[in-house]
Every structure is written in structure tokens, then in C-alpha cells.
Amino acid sequence: MLHELLLALLGFTGDLIVDEREQRKTLGLAFNSDSPLSDECTFKLAPDISFIEPSERDLIERLIKLGFYYRELDRFAKKSRNLSWIRSVTSVHPLERADELSKQSREKKPSVYRRAIANGIGEILSVYRSAVLHIEQKLLAETTPILATVTEGLNKFFVLFPPLYEVILEIERDDIRGGQLLNVLNKRCHCGVPELRTCLQRLLWNGHQVMYNQLAAWMVYGILQDPHGEFFIKRQDDGDLDHRSSQEEVSEKLARTSVHETSLTDWHSGFHISLDMLPDYIPMRLGESILFAGKAIRVLRNPSPAFQFQKDKSFQQTMRGSQRIRGFMHSDFPETETELDADLTGGELLPQSEADKIEAMLKDLKESSEFHKRSFECTVDSVRAIAASHLWQLVVVRADLNGHLKALKDYFLLEKGDFFQCFLEESRQLMRLPPRQSTGESDLMVPFQLAATKTIAEEDKYFSRVSLRMPSFGVTVRSSQADMVRSKVSLTGKANLTSDTSVDGWDAIALEYSVDWPMQLFFTQEVLSKYLKVFQYLIRLKRTQMELEKSWASVMHQDHIESAQHRKDGLNGSTSQQRRQGIRPMWRVREHMAFLIRNLQFYIQVDVIESQWKVLQTHIHDSQDFTELVGFHQEYLSALISQSFLDIGSVSRILDSIMKLCLQFCWNIENQESNPNTSELENIAEEFNKKSNSLYTILRSSKLAGSQRAPFLRRFLLRLNFNSFYEATARGVLNVVRQRPALPL
């Protein structure tokens, strides 16, 4: 009976102690170790045994539960470790072995985390087996009560095995893997039994070893070591791939793309955080820091071949950029950065000493017997800071971020006003005609290159990155002159000019900026599209302002010619005086238009662009963190768009209509020689008054007064209404039932 009991404690049943589940099976059919676990103990004393007292029976049945738990825990450990493939390494053909492993993977869903937990369970079961062996030796050597000795020797396992069995039961039932498995163990560690807590913490430690190995691969080498999809960092295309796909298949897919494309894809959308696999005790902020650190290390360890080729060529530019940055960053810039710059320009983007430092920090976490959240957070933050600092060195110093930002400001934000003034003057006559779908872009290239020749210095190395684009049109686009002619009927009929929703075809003028690695990490397509949005707005504003000036100069020049001709011919010029007197109210309208456009332009260029540029420069000089720079730059662009009212539909639509009216007014004014009828000008003036006063009403509306944009709206309104003339005009017009075609003096 002693040996029956000892064997049962090790999971082997016999005649005295039986397994009810096995008895239900057909005789001679082997028991399948992969069958689902039983929810309750199936080890029982044989019912036909009558020589055992009821009290002893109860004690034996209590003891043999340990044998049941041992067997189930042992089966779980063997199944999870699944090392049977080792036996066939030398006896099976490699292709057949690969097929077999693939089949086993599909059937059993391998998990490195389960394997680690199984190793921890194996350690506990080893202690249990030693205890059973010690009991056997003691019973054979001494004459002691059997049941009392066994109970005393295995008493601590009554506390350990039932909770452990509940853990593996939950794991098997819900197919828990990866970070979810760590969650289960971490929650169960919070218990009041010291022995059980120590045991569960050991299992959690085994699971953390796998996580730390994955973190080391990711944060030291930029490699995602996750063959079974259990890490909380995943590839973006993992949703399209079966988690059972081998690492070789993923590598083969990535090999089809170039290193350059892969690097950009990995940075922008290649990886993401899987919330299902992120342990609850790791905050989302830390998960994002781990994600960023790994992506940054990938970038630093895998630079673009073109960038490596240009390394020696850009050495002098690098040092100049580094000195310029230090000059802006005050006198307390660390001296160690000088050595770092030398190392970066001379060789590695991520020095081996830094990689060793990261690896040492992760190794300290790995060797700790318990998981300390504070230590984990400090380590992750330190690694992230190292990665962000070296990425900052790469982008800001080596790739000259400030130079690119200045170039975008020069060309997309019209900082080089002389260039765009020259370009608009050279292309003025061309833009009076409809843009041709086939040659519109090439037509514009002539004045564009001519303006560049006149105004752009040879040392401007960034101009070569700027190119002019004229998108093809999907619909028929009318020119400005055609809009003016076809709108005559509606103007004569006093219809609303804005009912015609077609836009000037030349408003689609676009700039493109060529960005190389690694600046593509900073200047994404989304960022460049925001720059383009502001550029198209500013170039229209610049063109409108120029047309208002040119129309005045053109008509004045024509008037002087006529006056000189009349004096030469000895005529009294009464007809010319009458025409000049009749059109004088229109010049007041033109002045009002120029006043509004000029102040809008001054507000955007000075109050918005220049002020936000200074804020951005301060952030760049004070920060050495790449992610902070990205955030500051996003704030800069958002401020440009928001403070220019491009995201306020009511304001932007009215300003758009006002610019169209200004252009139509200018072309009508210049055509007065051939078409002396002023009714069209009067209708344009009337419509402009309406739009101008609507703009004032919106700027003063209570709806926008409480918004975040209220200070900028008030600043723009202050420029327009610095002497209360704008307000008085608006009130006067709004109180009149029928608007007048001309503004009062």
C-alpha cells in the first residue's frame, strides 16, 4: 500500500488508487496526454477496498489529490516545452522535419512564454519529487506512521498545487499566451500566502526572462524577436499575416523591398503596440517609449546607403551645423557632445559603448528576482533618452534640420519675397489665360526658372530640392479672365458672385520639396501637405496684393499718357476729366481692398509666421530629444494653419471670396479703356462691401470669442480696425437697406 500511495503521489494510478477518467475509457485505449484538463480531481480510492477506515480513506483521498495535480502540472509542462523535435534532428530529413514542425505549430500553437512558465513549473515539481523521495527514504528507514509522515512531508504542497492547477487550467481553457500570461500571473501574485506568492513570483520571473530577451533584441539591436506573435510590439502587417508564419517568411517578404523603403515604412507605420499583449502593469506611455526606442535603434543601425556614401562629403557641413547649434544653445552645452559629434561623423550613428550601456541596464532588470515597476520605468526612460538623443544628433546636426526648416520657410511660407514677386511678375500675363492641361506645368517653369536666375544665389543649396508642380485637372478649369467674362450676367443681374463655385485654375500651383534620408523621418507626407496648404494660400494672397498694385500703376500710367497726349494736341481734356471723376469712387474701393489684403498679408507673415518661427527655433535650441522636436514642429504647423484661419470655414471662405473679387476688380479696372461701362465695377464693389462687412461680423461674433483662436482673431481685427474706420464702415453698411456701390469718404 505504501508504494501504491507513493506512486499515486507521482501521478501513477493502479489497483488501489484509480483514475475515474481513465476508467470511463475503453479498456486497452491509451490515454491521450493532450486531452483537455479535468476541472476536478479524478484520483480516487478503489470502491471495493473495505479494509481502510473511513478516517484513513478521507486522509488518503486528500493526499492523492496532490498526485492528480502533479500529473496535470507535469503534462502541461511537457506539452508546453514540446522538445520532442530534438530526438528527430539526426534521423529525419530537414524538409520533412520542417513540415513536421510546421504541422505541430499549427496544431499546438507554440508559445515561448508558456515554455518559460513550464520551466518554472518543472522546478516546483522537482522540489515535490524530492520531497516524495525523502518521505520514502524516511518510511523505509524508520518505523513511523505512514499517513502522518506523508501528510507532514507534503503539507506545504496543499497550499501550492491547487492554485497552480487553477492557473494552468485558465491558461489551457482560454489559450492564454504572451503578455496575457504575464497578466494572469501578476494578478495571482497578490495573495496573502507567502509560500504561494513566492512560487507565483518565480513563475512570473521565468515569463519576464522571455520579455527581457525580446526587449534586449528590440532596444539594443532593433530586431523584433517574436516568432509566435506574443510580444506587445508587432509589425503593422501582422494582421494580414497568420501568427503561425515563420520568421523566414517575414524576412523574405521584407527582402523584396529596398533598405531605404523598409526603413521609412518601419519608422512611420511598420510597427505598433498590441494592446492585447501589453501587460496591464506596463503603462501605455512606457509601451510607446519602448516602441520608439526600438524604431530609433533600427534607424541608427540601418542608415540609408546613400547617406553612408555622403558621410565623408558632409563632414564639414556637419561640424558647422554642430557649432551653429551649440551657439544657439547657450554656454552650458555639455563638452562631451564634441566627442560625440566626432564619433558620429567618423563612424557609427550608435556607438557600441551606448549599445553596451543599454544592454547592461536590461541585464540588471533581468537578473532581479522581482519585477520592480519603478526600476523598469527608469530603465525604459533611460534607453528612450539615449535613442532620442542620438536620433536628434542624426537629424538636427548631421542632416541639418534647421537648414531644411529655413528652406521650407523661404519657399513654402514665402520668406523669399523677392523671388515670388519676380515669379508672379514674369508669369502675370500667362496667368491671365486658362492653364493648359498638357503644358500648364512646363509653361510655368519658364518664369519660375527666370525668377530663380534673377533672385536665387548660387550658394542656396536647398533651392534644387524645390520643384514647381501644376496638378492635372479632372474637370474643365476656367481662367480668371473667363470667370470674369462669364460672371458679367450674374453681376448685372445682381446675383451672388459666390454661387459660381469654380476656382481659378492657377490656384492649384504647388511646390514639392525633395527630402532625403533621414529627414524623411521628420518631414512626412502629412507634414509637407500642410506646408503646401499654407503655400497655396499665401501665393494667392501675394498674387492678389500684386494685382491690386499693378492695376493702380497701369491705370495711372495710362492716365498720364492720355493727359500728355491731350496737352500735346491742345485739347481741354474734359472727357478724360469726366472719366477720371466717374471712376474715382472705384479707387476708394481699390484702396479698401488693398488695405484689407495688405493687413491680412502683414498679419500672417509677421504676427503668425515670424512669431511661431521664433518659438520653434527656441524649442530646437533647447531640446535634444527627437520626439520633442517632432511635437514642437507639429505645434508650429498647427499654429500656422489655425492662426491663418485656414481651419475656420466661415472665415476662410469669406477671405477666399474677397481675393476673387479683388482679382476681378483689377481686371475690370484695366479693361475700362475698351469697356468704359462702370456697372460691373459697381456690382463688384457692392459684393465686396458685403463680404468685407460679413468678415467684420464674424471676427466680432460671440461664437468665436470664447474659442482658443479668439486672441488671434482679435489681433487681426486690431490691424484692420486700428482707427475704427473698419468698424464704422461695417456698421454704416449693415444699417443701410440697399448697399451703395462705393464706399464713403
UniProtKB/Swiss-Prot annotation:
GO MF term list:
gamma-tubulin binding
Q: Where in the cell is it found?
A: Cytoplasm, Cytoskeleton, Microtubule organizing center; Cytoplasm, Cytoskeleton, Spindle
User: Where does the UniProt entry say this protein principally localizes?
Assistant: cytoplasm
Q: Which residues form a coiled coil?
A: none
Give the keywords, sorted.
Cytoplasm, Cytoskeleton, Microtubule
Q: Does the keyword Transport apply?
A: no
Expression is induced as follows: Up-regulated in galls upon nematode infection.
User: One GO cellular component from the entry?
Assistant: plasmodesma
Gene3D superfamilies associated with the record: Gamma-tubulin complex, C-terminal domain
Q: Which Pfam families match?
A: GCP_C_terminal, GCP_N_terminal
**Which BP terms in the Gene Ontology apply to this protein?**
cortical microtubule organization; microtubule nucleation; response to nematode
Protein family according to the UniProt entry: Belongs to the TUBGCP family.
* Annotated function: Gamma-tubulin complex is necessary for microtubule nucleation at the microtubule organizing centers (MTOCs).
Q: How does it assemble?
A: Gamma-tubulin complex is composed of gamma-tubulin and GCP proteins.
This one is known as: Gamma-tubulin complex component 4
Instruction: Specify the species.
Output: Arabidopsis thaliana (Mouse-ear cress)
